[in-house]
């Protein structure tokens, strides 16, 4: 429970810093949800898909010879989904509305991912 509460606290801070964020999910690299605030049953589905997208994105970065993956951004007609590796064990997915300041989203998303990685490392 403590891990979930600490992760949710960081995700709440992200929403406060980036008003266009409409929700987020943190999950393990295996796709198991840790915490989330997306509507309906989207958290579990998003967690499972996020793990797969992260794995594919890491592979693409490696194949392209471009170093370690920092983020994956999905740009859609009604907004954005950004995925961040939060250390070796956690994936953070952030959903944002159209018109979101992508520079701010990327900056704050990375900060939140780093905070989640630190939380996870203290749990071991």
Predicted regions and their residues:
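Acidic, low-complexity cytosolic segments
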Residues: 1-21, 29-124
């Amino acid at each position: 429970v403590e891990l979930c509460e600490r992760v949710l606290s960081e995700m709440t801070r992200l929403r406060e810093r980036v008003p266009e964020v409409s929700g987020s999910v943190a999950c393990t690299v295996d796709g198991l949800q840790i915490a989330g605030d997306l509507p309906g049953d989207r958290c579990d589905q998003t967690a499972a898909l996020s793990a797969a997208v992260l794995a594919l994105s890491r592979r693409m970065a490696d194949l392209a010879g471009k170093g370690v993956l920092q983020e994956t951004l999905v740009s859609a007609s009604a907004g954005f989904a950004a995925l961040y590796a939060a250390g070796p064990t956690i994936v953070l997915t952030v959903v944002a509305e159209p018109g979101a300041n992508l520079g701010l989203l990327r900056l704050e998303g990375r900060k939140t991912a780093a905070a989640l990685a630190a939380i996870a490392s203290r749990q071991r």
